[in-house]
Each structure stands twice: as structure tokens, then as C-alpha cells.
Amino acid sequence: MITLYDNPFSPFTRKVRMVLQWKAVAFESIDALAVAEHERLVAVNPRAEVPVLVDGDLTIVDSADIVAYLEDRFPSPAILPATPALRAKARSWQRIADTLLDAIIHDISLWTWPTHRRTDQPPPGLVEAGHRDLEEILAQLEASLDSAGFVCDAPSVADLALFPHLSSLKLLGVSLDPFPKVLQWNRQMRALPVVRAHLESVKRSALEKFAAAASPYEAEKVVWRGDRIEWLLAHGFQAWFQAELAAGRAIVRTSCSTKRNEIP
């Protein structure tokens, strides 16, 4: 049995879960970002990041690597297109989702997401910079969608990587209305059985987690990593980030453990 160390609110684990469900692969799920599961997570990934997939003696800790492994291990139904050109396109959009989209949405959502509970105000210009960059990516996606309404000829890892990020834009005040092809893509994605079931699962998880008297997650500190820090610094918010570090509200993983995609 495959074990997935995940979290219902992580876009990376949401992508992996949808790929597993797309391929009808049974798996055990562990909400590894819950404080109670922290030691179990560190045991398989010293950086304490999700997702982590364990299949027998094999441990894989990067979502793109997990997807690639699942495509090789369970080739049908495929989640990558058939032609080299479309495969490259799908991987390119997955990379945009995993790096740039994640960084922007993470950095401007700290004052929106209930998991963070920030009571201060964002630094001036941060949210506006995020909205501008998000709208630029949406314009690129609008131009990239094919005649079938997906990134490639049919639903692929590109769509499953983009959807968890783009489905959160409404909460951030970013509308898809100026992008009719993206709007139609969003409708088509929500009509897919795998995505429909996934959204119901996320909704149930949210109700369970936030209806509890005490959150199972660490709410006072935020984990930052390369892409998220890079986007922030590129837009001139070095002083704000340094203040977060000084106040102990930011966690930067420093482990350089070789326990990564470990094959005995």
C-alpha cells in the first residue's frame, strides 16, 4: 500500500492526490502537517514538507517527482500527453504552478487563509504586486489553452497542477472574468469526476479542521522556502521579511539531508 504524507490544503498534495485518484491507485493518507504527526513527517522528510510518497522501500519528497514516478509505475490512464511537444508543455505549466503560482499565492494569502490568523496588515504594495503577476499568468494561460479547453489535448498533469492554485483566486480577490477561456477551463475542470470528488474531500476537511475547538496546525509561524522568498525579495520586500525572521514568525528550512527520493 502506498502511503502519502499530505495535507488537504497544500496545493502540491492536492495535485498528487488527484493524480492517484485519476489512476485509481489506493493509498493511505496521513495529514502530516498536523502538529501531532510532525515526528512521523520528519522521519521520512527532515525538511518537514509535504507531500511525501512512500512505496515500500522507496521515499519520494517532491510533488513533480512523485507525479513522474506514478506515471511510470501506473502508466494507464496516462496523466502526461502522448507527444514530446505536449509533454514538454504540460511539464512547463506544472513548473509554473509549482514555483511561481505557489509563491505569489502563498505570499499574499497570509492575511486571508484561516490557517495563518494574521491580525496585522500586509506591507504596502505586496497584494497589488501579487495581483498584477497573477493576472499576467492568467493572460498567458488564456493564450495557451487549446481548442479542447485544456492546456494540452486532454486533461493532464498541467491542469491538475494549476487547478488547486487557481481555484483559490476568488478568496484573494482575483477574478477569472476577464479571461473567458480560463473561466471555461475552470468550469470544465470542476466537471471532471476526479476534481469534483477532490473538492468535496477538501470541503469536508476544512469543515472538520476549522470546526474543531483547537486547530491541529501551527498557526503562528509560516514556513518559507526558495521560490516564495525569491518572489518576495524580487518585489522589494526584504525589510519586511527580515522583520518576520527577527520576530520568529518565519521558518526557513535549512536541512540539507540526503534523504530525498531515497532508493536503498
Predicted regions and their residues:
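Short, structured secondary-structure boundary patches
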Residues: 27, 47-53, 198-202, 218-221
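Charged/polar, low-hydrophobicity segments characteristic of intrinsically disordered regions
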Residues: 193-209
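GST-like fold's C-terminal all-alpha helical module
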Residues: 97-194, 252, 256
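Residue-level signal for well-ordered alpha-helical positions
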Residues: 73, 93, 172, 201-202
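GST-like domain detector, emphasizing the conserved glutathione-binding G-site
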Residues: 1-128, 228-264
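Long, charge-rich low-complexity segments
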Residues: 204-239
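Residue-level detector of family-conserved "landmark" positions at structurally sensitive sites
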Residues: 30, 63, 179, 199-200
